[in-house]
Amino acid sequence: MCGRYVSPDEASIEREFTLVRTEWQFPPSYNVAPTQKVPVVRAAQDGARTGARLHWGLIPFWAKGVQPKYSTINATVEKLTDGATWRGPWKRGQRCIIPALGFYEWQVQADGKSKQPFYLTLNDQEIFGFAGLWDSSTGADGVAIESCTIVTMPANQLMTEVHNVKHRMPAILAVEDREAWLTAAPAEAFTLIKQYPDTHMVATAVSTRVNTPKNNDATLIVPV
């Protein structure tokens, strides 16, 4: 799974993803956590890339604005096309890119109880994008809530060693696949969900301060 990550500031995202319209202003976050509003990149009907901040934890359109009781921060690739929560936005082409500088995963230690957090980055993309889905759900008060989820998949070798219980990792898009992920037909988009090569990933042990979401500063990504 992917439950915590580092997000760039709005100017960096606008440059990296060539955005033409945005609805945001925010600093970088070193400890993005579920239920927070997170920056995402989407394609408008005219094809232009736009940015917005969405609730992290997908609320399906049929949920009437109420967060499901089960976790929806990650959409497993195995259920992407037919799972009750995901198939609607998938078939409607509601795909997005969730920009990141890196993400955190926890490695269970030899005692079977303690966990060591690791910070994962790429050595070929400073700012990269998770493959995501988004949806809009209107509550009883008539207010629409836009929300998103990160697609996850079986881990590569490095992530198997770090995320050593569930063996999962987020789907990270190759730079050349970003446009197609946003605009292609679902069948083509599905082929873009690939294991990112572990040779292009770096895992760094970091402080357990990251365990607490209220801790949010650059020291969280300093090696220990």
Could you describe each region identified by the protein language model?
Residues 1-224:
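Short linear sequence motif anchored by a di-proline
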